[in-house]
A protein has these predicted regions:
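Basic, ligand-binding patches in group-transfer machinery
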Residues: 116-223
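Hydrophobic core segments within long, regular secondary-structure runs in both alpha-
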Residues: 75-82, 104, 123-134
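P-loop NTPase catalytic cores that bind/hydrolyze ATP
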Residues: 94-117
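Residues within HEAT/ARM-like alpha-solenoid scaffolds
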Residues: 72, 94-98, 124
Length: 223
């Protein structure tokens, strides 16, 4: 995002950055290339910005994800970043990170809205996202996602609207109460059989990826 950054004007001018106009999410196709091209980036640990969930009619663009113009604009700016990668980025690990982010964050915002849309609108949304994924993202990336994310994309790619809605509704209503058991070296989620079964419920990799960490700010020696 652009609203919590200070950018050197010399760096901005040298790389001819500019935000695209008349489109939502105009920060994405600028800030991602900006991080790639920068010689260094300084991060401030203190909280300097708080994102507010707005009530009423004046919602943020992220809260208006059921608007299809919003979704199409998001995919448009993702394509802008895709183009930058094609022209500039050689590191495969960055490509893999981009694919993962697109699925885990950027597109999932709209996938999750399936429970608020009519059947026809849900199917329309699924087709738009499916077309973009097939065009741009290696399908094996889906297998790297956490269990429910993976299963939602499998349903989407199969245009199985009823299963997608069932998965999302379970996630909203019951996922927070999921029990996880250890079997050997694996951690298995005890999902209802209608949601996830067998080896598909293996959550080991996801738990390893999101292992809790904490920053150390100070160390003192006590005699």
């Amino acid at each position: 995002t652009s609203w919590n950054k200070l950018i050197l004007k010399e760096f901005w001018d040298r790389n001819h950055f500019e935000f695209p106009e008349r489109i939502l999410y105009e920060d994405i196709p600028v800030t991602i290339p900006m991080h790639y091209l920068a010689n260094n980036v300084t991060m401030v640990q203190d909280v300097c910005y708080r994102w507010r969930i707005r009530d009423g009619a004046n919602k943020s663009i992220t809260q208006r994800a059921d608007d299809f113009t919003n979704m199409r604009d998001r995919i448009t700016v993702l394509r802008m970043v895709d183009k930058f990668f094609e022209e500039n980025v050689k590191e495969q690990e960055l490509w893999d990170a981009k694919y993962y982010k697109w699925l885990y964050i950027d597109l999932m915002i709209y996938v999750n809205n399936c429970i608020y849309l009519s059947d026809n609108r849900t199917l329309e949304m699924m087709k738009i996202i499916k077309d973009y994924i097939e065009e741009t993202i290696p399908l094996e990336t889906i297998d790297k996602l956490p269990v429910l994310y993976r299963e939602k994309y499998v349903a989407l790619m199969n245009l199985d609207e009823k299963r997608l809605v069932k998965l999302r509704q379970y996630e909203v209503d019951n996922y927070k109460n999921l029990k996880i058991v250890k079997k050997g070296n694996k951690y298995i989620g005890k999902f209802p059989k209608a949601i996830v079964t067998g080896d598909k419920a293996d959550m080991t990799e996801a738990l390893d990826q999101w292992r809790l960490t904490q920053l150390i700010y100070d160390v003192a020696w006590q005699k």
